[in-house]
Amino acid sequence: NSNGVVSVASAGNDGQQIMVYPGGLPGVVDVASTSNQDTQSVFTNYGAPPVYLAAPGEGVVTTYPWGTYAAGWGTSFSAPFVSGTAALMLGQNGGCSVSSVASGLAKADGISDPQLGHGRLDTYSAVQFCHQ
């Protein structure tokens, strides 16, 4: 956007085709969740628009209190994959401009669920988009 920021938000975990905010705002990349089978997670909100794409959101290992680790589920685990990919796209030498990040993210893996926007995040293809 005009402030040089890529805004990414989780789509929500109501298992419904509803718009939640801030993901429903213009210019925000709204992220749904997929399973390890590349299918729509049962809990994820869905529908395009506003869902722009999906990323893994089930069984994501994360840090946990007292120096341990645990697996987490939810679109709040999906959105950081997209944020990290956007950072890689912007950080590449000669990388993408902020305005072209969404186009690169749209180079997602074409899983066959139109409710998940452009499909599942493909970090490699998104970063390669910046070098075309």
What are these regions (language model features)?
Residues 3-4, 20, 27-30, 42, ...:
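C-terminal subdomain of the subtilisin-like protease fold in secreted/lumenal serine endopeptidases
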Residues 54, 76, 120:
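Short aromatic/basic micro-patch
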Residues 1-64, 103-108:
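Catalytic-core segments of hydrolase enzymes
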Residues 77-94:
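Short, small-residue alpha-helix embedded
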Residues 40-41, 65-77, 112:
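Short pre-catalytic strand/loop immediately N-terminal to key active-site residues, enriched for Gly-Thr
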Residues 10, 55, 72, 82, ...:
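Short glycine/serine/threonine-biased micro-segments
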